[in-house]
Amino acid sequence: MLKHAAYPTLAEAVRHVAAALDVRVLANPKACDRMDRAAATGDFDLDLFEELVEDMLYRPLESLGDEPFAYELAAVMRGWRRQYIPIVGRVSSDALPRHELLPLLVEYVFAGWVADVLKHLEHVGLIRSAWLMAGSGQGLCGDPPALPVATVIQAFLWQYGAASNDAPSALYAQPDDGTRDRSTEQVSRWMSGSTLPSLGSIRLVVATAVSRPWFRATHWKGARDEFQRELLIARALQYSASLVAPYGDFLQMVRAELQERRLVDIGLLISRAVYARGEPMGLSLIGLQTAHALDFRDAKTNSQLNEAEALLDEFRAQARHLDAPWAVEWMVTWCEARLAAWRSDFKTSMELYETAFATSVYRSGREARNILIEALTLAGSLGKRPHLKRLIHQGKALDILPRVLGDLEPQPWNGRLIADILTKCYAPHFPQPTSLSPRSSPQGMRTTNEVKPADAAG
């Protein structure tokens, strides 16, 4: 459904961090499957996100014996969600495919977020220096810039008096014949950036290093965990940089943010890119006209519905010919859901509303809230408690749940109450079945014509 989602989903973010730290191998296979499904569907369920952070990040890191890092990383991911959701809910990336949106997100959102995380970890004493983790942006004597893994290893050796021009040989005891063993060559490849260390190889090199005489004579309590933690974070940074390499030097972006944190209106940058595309924006306007023709602020005659259906057919046909048809699929589906509701096909309408909402949170901006309101209204009318619960949790995660609902939670008895509240406030002519059957006859429909909609901008 969200194969072409412009924004990386929440579950994709968890999956990326788990892969960057190489801790997926320590996670429960069922949790991995749940994460992959959520990444594909783009589910914004807050409870699911919390479970994924717990199962995919906190517990694997805790099993390594590094509970402080596990705790801080879980807290950081929760904080990231609170920063990221407003961007998704506020900024319309309508008509921007992922390959056009990601460069903006990488440079103006993700790099700054990583810099903030490194500063936080330094502040709480889990790493020695944020600058150390970002690598050296300038090499010595014409050498290429040092990568994070290389700077961490060199700093570790220097701290314990084992600094050497041949860092890999300093970590491992060398054979008497002067040759370099396989492990030493492996570390050389890490430091050059030709390969990334795995979690298992990091644990092995840490165990080897802390057994050397120069370390045992000078180390402090917690030094082993610090070295392993810094190597994991350095690996994660290089892993991320390799994935976004087509969009620029990510490590240099992070270093720039460490030097001076920029305040950028990402919404303005995305809007400029959207308007530069031209044609899709015009098509979006046609879609909004179609949606307006099917809204629930006033009653509709059969003639008006037929005209709206013809407009929808035209909108759907034009959308298929876009270079990026997924840019307006949420709007097409939303209009189809509204038309199905007017035609009393409530079962189909419910399915379409859920699809429209799931795709709209990535591209529609504020319209996602309107879709959520209508989906909640229909789910309440049909007594669909699982749908209500899921939609309410997603609305809370996106911070777009109507304030008129307060802290109301879906119960077996209050579905109709939720529907009535939303109908009176937002959609006075929303068709509602008098029974819980998926499809009711026109005679079974009722509207609250006598109710004047409240000014419920919240």
What are these regions (language model features)?
Residues 1-5, 32-37, 173-198, 206:
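Recognition helix of helix-turn-helix/homeodomain-like DNA-binding domains
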Residues 1-4, 14-24, 42-85, 198-220:
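DNA major-groove recognition helix of helix-turn-helix/homeodomain DNA-binding modules
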Residues 1-24, 32-42, 103-173:
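A short, Lys/Arg-rich alpha-helix, primarily the initiator
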Residues 138-144, 148-156, 160, 186, ...:
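Disordered, low-complexity "stalk" and linker segments at domain junctions of extracellular
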Residues 210-240:
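Short C-terminal boundary/hinge segments that cap the last helix of small helical domains
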